[in-house]
Amino acid sequence: ELWLSKVQAGNLYVNRAITGAIVQRQPFGGWKKSTVGSGTKAGGPSYLIALSDWEPAQATATATTQSVTVRETLATIENSELGKRDDFAFIKRGVSSDAHAWDTEFGFGHDPSKLGVERNILRYVPTQVLVRADESASAAETLRVVLAGLAANAPVALSVGKDLPVDVRGVLENKGIKYEVKSDAQFREYLASNAKTPVRALAGTPLEGTRIRYIGNDEKSIYSALGGRPDVAVYFAPVTEAGRIEMLPFLREQAVSITAHRFGNPNRFSERVISSR
């Protein structure tokens, strides 16, 4: 149980060989330097999402979020000047879609094969993301992405080109979000200064999770500032209301394969350690 909660790897194996990954049963893809860019696990349910382009459309989910953090943040936004704008409905629909995505996909481990003698669980582990909203980004887009991160229970660092209202900024900081205001030029300088910084040395910084969710219209400058380093993933697609898409940057996929028998006799010890559906 301790090992499963601490180990940092994309594929974990307990009491079995580490070779023989199979589509759906054991989606494959590593963490850290075992992966490049913003891809997802091969053979997993999100594989095609990372290979596709997505355009915003109105979400239809009506689920209610169970996250107190999200509810309190949304209430503060609604009571601020942003709540009086037409695009607040965009934020609310996004929150409902996040809740639906959490209830149906991200909030628990999946074992679709259900072999019985072997458990193959795909689960989602929250990871820190640096959300960058450049000077062209709207407040609604920024908050929609941040709320997706909060719904995923992920640590979020937020860098904005334009400051948000004081009360909204206050609730974000109260929820543990690392908040800063940087011009586009200042942000590029920050990235350039860390273009060659080893990943371990990024611990404790906004780039600790080696993931950037970029909201803006100049993603090329972000890649250039990073010097093309492959171990920092940049998500730059248009902001959507779909929780199934917007929550992905804040979650790392982890496949856990556990032998559930001993000499042919079923052994259910792992069910006390890791649950699945």
Stretches found by the model and what they are:
Residues 1-128, 132-144, 151-277:
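C-terminal segments
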